[in-house]
């Protein structure tokens, strides 16, 4: 009698442990897969673009549409190449394993722009003049963001309306926007 009771309790504890692990894995998967949707539905400061930041940071989990001249790379960081017919290329990248999460946009005029975790412009470099630093205050940020969204906004558009089966907006807000 004691032996069967111990075995029964052990089996129940094992099943509960497995269910707890699966639930935690699902929560993490849900937050990453639907991160663009969740980021779109939070209040954020003007000049920040959390939808694009989440699309880049979670590129391995979100839907990536197959588009002509678009190439995705995810070996160590996430990089998207958009090549035009005249072989000019714009690149956007994210390195989630870096200590400070940075997003970098390289345009075909040999300028690179560096953004913080909320996708707010911090600084830039102009490699056509020898890596001179560009002050963020001198950049036409509306035109820059418009250019970025023209080239890479399809990622946000493809994921912003993908609603999760279980809405975990509160958990997303706790994790990313404390």
Residue map of PLM features:
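N-terminal export/targeting and maturation segments
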Residues: 19-102
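N-terminal Sec-pathway targeting helices
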Residues: 1-24
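Generic detector of bulky aromatic hydrophobic side chains
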Residues: 10-12, 46-48, 162
